[in-house]
């Protein structure tokens, strides 16, 4: 069990809300993930949840580099992101998925292949330890119940049904995810910051 937890959120309202939920069990700061202001080398583990997919290449690298700065040598960085598959996917199809996804969720999402995610982490100085994928189930009802609980899922559905604009957006997202379901997946990658003298290319 970690000695302490520190959460980082760029949205001050979200940071305040999580801070109230966490209470004395951890710390939550309002900061950018690419420039947290936290102490270098003080973290044993850094976790990024569905954050990098929504960033451009420059921002992706900035956030990962900040995670590397925060980690002590041997510390681990774990990410959970959206990926496209297979690694040999046609570039034209990959581009079309990115465009349609960005149009559906109103964010310039840029999912990578699993190989590209691993390469990005390695370019920032990390050693990839494991890569695991799972079917894309972001808007799957049964998955939502497992993740959020029955009552919370009902509240989400109520909010969606009562807001025409939100409803149209969610339905658009669902349609896009279903259209490209066979080429999209969730990916979880764990990498570590090399120890002094460790071969960066060692897997």
Regions found by a protein language model. Name each.
Residues 1-36:
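Class I SAM-dependent methyltransferase SAM/SAH-binding core
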Residues 4, 76, 127:
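Residues at the starts of beta-strands that form the adenosine-phosphate
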Residues 34-46:
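A short acidic, Gly/Pro-enriched loop at the edge of an enzyme's catalytic core
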Residues 44-59:
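A short SAM/SAH-binding and catalytic strip from SAM-dependent methyltransferases
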Residues 61-76:
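A short glycine-rich, Lys/Arg-flanked "PGG" loop and its adjoining helix->strand segment in the class I
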Residues 77-100:
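Conserved class I S-adenosyl-L-methionine
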Residues 108-125:
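Short alpha-helix
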Residues 130-203:
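Conserved Class I S-adenosyl-L-methionine
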């Amino acid at each position: 069990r970690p000695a302490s937890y520190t959460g980082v959120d760029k949205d001050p309202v979200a940071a305040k809300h999580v801070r109230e939920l966490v209470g004395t069990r951890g710390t939550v700061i309002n900061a950018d993930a690419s420039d947290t202001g936290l102490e270098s080398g003080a973290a044993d583990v850094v976790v990024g949840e569905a954050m990098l997919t929504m960033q451009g290449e420059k921002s992706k690298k900035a956030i990962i580099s900040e995670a590397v700065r925060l980690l002590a040598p041997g510390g681990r960085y774990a990410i959970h992101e959206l990926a496209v598959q297979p690694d040999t996917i046609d570039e034209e199809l990959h581009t079309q998925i990115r465009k349609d996804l960005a149009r559906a969720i109103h964010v310039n999402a840029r999912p990578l292949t699993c190989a590209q995610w691993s390469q990005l982490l390695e370019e920032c100085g990390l050693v990839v330890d494991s890569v695991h994928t799972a079917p894309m189930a972001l808007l799957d009802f049964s998955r939502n119940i497992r993740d959020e609980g029955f009552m919370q899922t009902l509240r989400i559905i109520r909010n969606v049904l009562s807001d025409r604009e939100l409803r149209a957006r969610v339905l658009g997202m669902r349609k896009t995810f279903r259209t490209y379901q066979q080429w999209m997946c969730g990916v979880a990658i764990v990498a570590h910051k090399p120890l002094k003298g460790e071969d960066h290319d060692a897997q």
